[in-house]
Design a protein with these regions (language model features):
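Alpha-helical transmembrane bundle of multi-pass membrane proteins
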Residues: 1-248, 252-254, 271-483
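Short, well-structured alpha-helical segments
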Residues: 262-271
Length: 483
């Protein structure tokens, strides 16, 4: 049977749309805590066998990040041994188990509705399981899309994974808002009283005892859909060539690129995958340092302190309905992510990172100056928006693009795993430290610190990060060899 000479764009798009569901789940899982954390706090404050301190609250709000570190660290080994597709199926299963377990941490064993230390530990274990799914998806989804997509549109398609992450965060902001509904105000007012408010019944009781369960449980829908649909997409041609399944790899390439082009691409892939593996420091320490520090700065600028605690921050500013502002912030984030998608190949990576760093510094310092002043409430909100929007067109998407591009071919798999693991480690550090630092040192100090780090990030990019716009991956190998 004669193969088509032109590829099927519809087939490619359908594959990518399934793959970016992993990105959507990445965003959904990491942002669901923003609406649930105050309910969780009030619920566990009623425990009699331990005291739910700021430390416990910070740990519970960020426990999924422990799993993210584990999942990202294992991503290279799993993707190489299991394949990209099976790794993503596993991630989908982890998402589903975590959503169900976080909704019902009692799991028919512990008494429902009775807060205690054992229940808190079980809840956090389920969040760690979800984090493993996030860590895997954060590394393998861009890898899968990059290996399945034609080279002329690869950058654009990989960027849509970041769009899906932000879209997932926006979706869960809406979900959280509609789950709470009229229960929002009573729930916020009751946090200081913990379970005392629950004992009186009413709207606060539902929000604190049940609302957060629905938020986590809602993730079962996209998680189940992703785990099911990913079963029907092909493995990547690059992985198939690595394990000697050339015929199958060529058939997939032909469906995407056409038969004639498929033969050329397969030859290039085979030349790449048969190259001798090199040691991590073959290209020097600077190469690894740049990749790792890109990940560190992406988190150290403090963006997840906004994403995870947005309702709490807006409430502390004095706004009556913080969930509405959180949803609006999500819409702004989505729009500015599109700015990056449409400008990264025109302006380059470094200019966007430097401009974004300075914009974040301006926004963070603005928050530090205006926070707590009722006369500057609107200016404080605008500063938060500037801070968040600046991240979304710079460090949010561009960091992932650079991490995928900056490492030489022969060390990319291991180097990306290390860089992404550092990203999740610092994500955990920032999100765990935010509440204790803000409560003890003040929001002004916390955001002032983030502003200083943003300025340091701009200097780092200016001095050390190479521009990868218009360069092939082989050019990066030559660059690091030269240096």
């Amino acid at each position: 049977m004669e193969q088509k000479q032109t590829g099927s764009k519809a087939y490619l798009i359908s594959i990518v749309m399934v793959a970016v569901l992993g990105g959507l789940l990445f965003g959904y899982d990491t942002a669901v805590i923003s609406g649930a954390e105050k309910g969780l706090q009030a619920f566990f404050m009623g425990a009699e066998d331990f005291t739910y301190t700021d430390f416990w609250h910070g740990f519970t709000s960020s426990s999924a990040l422990i799993g993210c570190i584990i999942g990202s660290a294992l991503s290279g080994v799993m993707a190489s041994n299991w394949g990209r597709k099976r790794s993503l199926i596993f991630a989908g299963v982890m998402f589903f188990i975590s959503a169900w377990g976080s909704m019902c941490p009692e799991s028919l064993v512990l008494p429902k509705g009775a807060p205690n230390l054992t229940l808190l530990i079980v809840f956090n274990l389920y969040r760690v399981i979800g984090g493993i799914g996030v860590g895997l998806a954060s590394a393998v989804c861009p890898m899968y899309i990059g290996e399945i997509a034609p080279s002329n549109i690869r950058g654009m398609l990989v960027s849509w994974n970041q769009f899906a992450i932000i879209f997932g965060q926006l979706v869960v902001y809406f979900v959280n808002f509609f789950i709470l509904g009229d229960h929002i105000a009573p729930a916020i007012q009751s946090v200081g009283n913990g379970m005392n408010q629950i004992l009186n019944g009413g709207e606060a009781a539902w929000a604190i005892e049940t609302g957060w369960r629905y938020m986590f449980g809602s993730e079962m829908i996209p998680a189940g859909l992703f785990a099911l649909l990913i079963c029907f997409v092909p493995e990547t041609p690059r992985y198939l060539a690595m394990v000697g399944q050339d015929a199958k790899a060529e058939r997939i390439l032909a469906r995407i690129n056409g038969a004639e082009e498929a033969k050329k691409i397969l030859n290039d892939i085979k030349n790449t995958v048969t190259e001798k593996k090199e040691k991590m420091l073959t290209y020097g320490v600077l190469c690894i340092f740049v990749g790792v520090m890109l990940s560190v700065f992406q988190q150290a600028v403090g963006i997840n302190a906004v994403l995870y605690y947005a309702p709490r921050i807006y409430e502390a500013m004095g706004f009556d309905n913080p969930m509405v502002l959180t949803v609006f912030n999500g819409i702004v984030n989505l729009g500015f992510t599109c700015v990056a998608i449409f400008t990264v190949e025109k302006l380059g990576r470094k200019p966007l990172l430097i401009i974004g760093s300075l914009g974040m510094a301006l926004g963070a310092i603005g928050v530090a100056i205006t926070f707590g002043n009722p006369n500057l409430q609107l200016l404080c909100m605008v500063s938060i928006m500037v801070y968040s929007a600046s991240f979304m067109f710079s460090w949010g998407p561009i960091c992932w693009v650079l991490i995928a591009e900056v490492f030489p071919n022969t060390i990319r798999g291991a180097a990306v795993a290390i860089a992404v693991a550092f990203q999740w480690i610092f994500n955990w550090i920032v999100s765990t430290s935010f509440v204790p630092m803000a409560n003890s040192l003040g929001y002004w100090f916390t955001y002032g610190l983030y502003g200083v780090i943003c300025i340091l990030a701009a200097i780092f990019v200016w001095k050390l990060v190479p521009e990868t716009k218009g360069k092939t991956l082989e050019d990066m190998t030559k660059l690091w060899k030269k240096n």
